[in-house]
């Protein structure tokens, strides 16, 4: 008996050594630290849930992937071209400016021209849609076959794909990409055929090169190698015996443009790489888009013509500006694309920082907040799937740091303890017996190269949908645990499985298990939520904010675990997606949405349309708030454009008719707090306590993924901190800056084990102890005294020659009104600096007095340095001469504070750009608030302070005098002689109140006679 006991003990030791706690004993599971994932599809435990919809979700993606032998390993999903891999041919794809579709007969090519686009309001449903037509301008076919058997993915890179249509030996390989106005076609066992429903107008015929227009005036070119001439001119079918052709979408019917496109028509793009860097010292994310081409004829250049989206050309690096083809423009669903030629171009964006939570700076009732925290312990998951459970653990991860701040350390550990229990369950694929579980596990599908969580939801398994949304919540929970327990987060413990989930939705290049950046489109700048994209409108994404939530959580997790490469990759994704959201979801610059489109947000962005509707209903709040939730320490980008925040809020309030929000009231309050926290507090206090303990069936006041505690904490913090200030950056990634009435607050969190000193771009610095927020506001000016004599007033004209430093410019006497000097001899890259410009309030525009006898250029307004934060820009035209002066206007986003302002000049290096005489900033409520233009003058009212306005009159011909006639609230008429300043006449009116109505007119002298204007009305 003793010998047998020894043998049994030895066997138990072997088992323990082979399968330590948390490791997998199943041959169908792979151990990762203390966790594991399944490699065999599990037998799903439905837990008594018989709903067919739920059961249908618990499957796998399609077994068949349409790809050639050239494409091996993990398969790219969630792309704009994804349907090519899962359809026998494909659904519509949107490689802007084209839309294309593979069919049995060939490739259908279409350009969704502006006249095809429609804005449709469904008033009964409460939805809006911006959509184009689905059609065919012509079909690219193969001379050797009338019908192909299938289309497959033959190759792909960061933004191009090669589709292969095949029927035995008859093959047609088609290379096309988003942002490419070319389609490259290569033939096997046959040659080119272009088929039209109506014969095209061939307006340029040069043998192997033709320019043609469709019956509805869309302009194209077709290129074959020299010596291979086109046939069938005048008919509905054009043919060419070449085994290679290129199709180009021309911006206009223009022979010179056709010649430019011919230069690159024989340079087939074989690779395209978006290579990015993050400069931690400056917060700059630089992305270089580069192509590698193969010459189809001798001498073809290694380059192409790109079509840039607004989010790209708005942030184009100065080194790439001279490559722009400004007149080469395409109008698409996302606004205007602009052409650029070359091998590469570069964009520069500014990373604004994220936080693990807001700090403990709110003026709140701490006992009340603690009560809300304890109330939240009664909350529970609203589902067993990766999304509903994800929302629950995301909620717990938000509550834990607030509990820490309130000194409720046991409660904070209770929240984190529950997070650990849930994650550790899900991160193990096997049960205590070593067998695969039937739920609460992750399974690796080798066919596609993806991790699938069960229970699944929203087609996260069957279509590979929403992985960044769902798994982002798991990473949020892990990041909060790691903030307090670094041991738990180590790879040999549970961190390895968290890293695996992250790799699934944002893997690096050359990952053995997963495709590169599964969810993200480097060229379009946004994520795509659908894995397969089998829709006629292409791929789509609804909750852009949950994408930003995912990138935020990876930044926090990577910073907590010391993974700098992962952190920087997430910063690239966060910063780039932010720029796309501002354009295509919010239209903060008011240049994307058509004028007839009513809402201030697009809820779902598609390749081929834009929807103001959700996937599940048409609730008014949901159509906005699905692109806000969940609020967290990375949500501060939502407040970067306060003018837009106010527009969106007011449009939502107007649509509902009151502040009695129909659902998710707390999300509206939290959004409102970005610009008007006092109003947000009033709304919150009026109804937050009408919500008792957690009730998932009642989301009118509190959305199920949030809590009263977080809502109360968030709004009170913003009431004390003020507005988010993105104009100041830091040399550390976990930070935020706020500005309240000109006083900045600097927030930093330090995940490391040592104290750090963080430098800000405005000269401020902060020391932060390990594993904590900073205490106090650090060193450096945060609230400069406006009375200091050396401060410059941006709302009065600043003479250009009164600079504090410059590079490259000279001064000369000016003929402009007022005399004095102007600056001139300005070339690309020159700049002037104006120190200590003090903005007492937001500025939204700048006026610059300019003259130019060349095509002009652009003036960038930056702070801190010539390459500092970009606040706005102004386009300068040819004015007709070096002393022919015009006033040009541009938009800026400047919050209160004191800055060193730089005017940086951009344009062609081949000539002098412009002269500048003066510039002036306009505050919100100035400039366009009340302005009237007449051939003789521009006149109106600009706001100055809370109780003052300036009435201005700018005559087009010099006036010897201007009088203003004024009535306030229909009172006695007052008459004043106005004061002339550099050709513009002004009169300040004081002691006004909100709601006052001003009626005013002018009498002015012009070349001897005097004239009187009509009366104008302005309401305060």
Swiss-Prot record:
Q: Name one GO molecular function term.
A: carbohydrate binding
Q: Where in the cell is it found?
A: Secreted
UniProt superkingdom: Bacteria
Transmembrane annotation, as ranges: none
Q: A Gene Ontology biological process annotation?
A: polysaccharide catabolic process
The annotated region (beta-sandwich subdomain) lies at 28-251
Q: Where is this region: (alpha/beta)6 barrel subdomain?
A: 360-722
Reactions performed catalytically:
Hydrolysis of (1->3)-beta-D-glucosidic linkages in (1->3)-beta-D-glucans
Region alpha/beta subdomain: start-end pairs: 252-350
Q: Where is this region: Disordered?
A: 771-790
- Residue numbers binding (1,3-beta-D-glucosyl)n: 387, 391, 458, 466, 470, 530, 540, 542, 546, 699, 704, 812, 825, 853, 878, 912, 915
Protein's UniProt name: Glucan endo-1,3-beta-D-glucosidase
| Organism in which the protein naturally occurs | Halalkalibacterium halodurans (strain ATCC BAA-125 / DSM 18197 / FERM 7344 / JCM 9153 / C-125)
